[in-house]
Structures are given as structure tokens and as C-alpha cells.
UniProtKB/Swiss-Prot annotation:
InterPro entries: Golgi_TVP15 (IPR013714). The gene is TVP15. The chain crosses the membrane at residues 14-34, 37-57, 69-88, 94-116. Present with 4540 molecules/cell in log phase SD medium. One of its GO terms (cellular component) is Golgi membrane. Belongs to the TVP15 family. It comes from the Eukaryota. This is Golgi apparatus membrane protein TVP15. Keywords: Golgi apparatus, Membrane, Transmembrane, Transmembrane helix. It is found in: Golgi apparatus membrane. It is a multi-pass membrane protein. Pfam families: COPI_assoc. Golgi membrane protein involved in vesicular trafficking.
Length: 143
């Protein structure tokens, strides 16, 4: 991997971690409004774990995540996830507006990286020999 690719990977990872952290803060603020707006808090209950996984996955692999949520392991999957999180987040406060903007922009950046032929592969995208489908690691022969 060339030096430019390493700088690009570091930048993309920093962007994803920052976006995930700000989105997590935005969903925490949205969750705190459970008394005034229940549906916003319900959306935050779904968005919070998805945004926490965006950050956590950049530092450490999650067991079985690749089998059940393989969209975390491609640029297009992360782009769609970030656009979904942006739609789930109601931009009412400062953190929520920042998170909405960052999620929306990062979603389009990830989609552009998926369509680019020279996009570097992130270390968190590596398969490490695990199967991508449920039960594919078992070698059962049917007779």
C-alpha cells in the first residue's frame, strides 16, 4: 500500500469515526426527549446502536457482525446506513444538525468511494477468513 493510500485510509477512518461519534451524540440527545416526543425517542433507540457500531468497528472487529450485518463491510453498505441514520435523526438541536449534515455528506462520500475504482480498502472491511453467509462455514454434505 502506497503512502497516499495510507493517508487516504487514515482520513476515511477518521471521518467515519467522527461521523459515528457525532451521530451517537445526536441520537443520545434525541433519546433524552422521550417525554416530549415519543416517536423521536423510538427512532433514537434504533439509530443509537447502529451509530455506535460505526465507531466501534473501526477499532475492533465484532464477532458475527459480518454474517448478520454485512453492509458494514462495504462502502455502499455504509453509505446506505449513514443515509438511513440521517433520515432517522431529527435535526432539532445543534448536535442533531451537525450529525445530520455529517451523516448525509459522509453517506454520499462513501457511495462515491464505492463507485471509484481506486478507493482504498479499509482494514475494517477485511474478511479474516470468516464466511459471509449463515452456515457457510459448515461443510455439511447432504446425501
Amino acid at each position: 500500500m502506497s503512502e497516499n493510500d495510507q493517508k487516504g485510509v487514515k482520513f476515511i477512518r477518521a471521518l467515519l469515526v467522527t461521523t459515528g461519534a457525532v451521530a451517537t451524540l445526536g441520537f443520545l440527545v434525541q433519546l433524552s426527549e422521550v417525554a416530549s416526543e415519543f416517536l423521536a425517542a423510538a427512532r433514537a433507540c434504533f439509530g443509537l446502536p447502529l451509530s455506535v457500531l460505526l465507531v466501534y468497528l473501526e477499532f475492533r472487529p465484532v464477532p458475527l457482525l459480518q454474517q448478520y450485518a454485512s453492509f458494514y463491510y462495504s462502502y455502499m453498505g455504509r453509505a446506505l446506513l449513514q443515509l438511513l441514520l440521517a433520515v432517522m435523526l431529527l435535526p432539532a438541536g445543534f448536535f442533531q444538525v451537525c450529525a445530520f449534515t455529517m451523516l448525509f455528506m459522509t453517506g454520499f462520500i462513501c457511495a462515491a468511494l464505492e463507485l471509484s475504482s481506486s478507493a482504498p480498502e479499509l482494514p475494517s472491511f477485511r474478511n479474516d477468513g470468516r464466511a459471509l453467509s449463515i452456515g457457510a462455514e459448515e461443510d455439511d454434505d447432504m446425501i
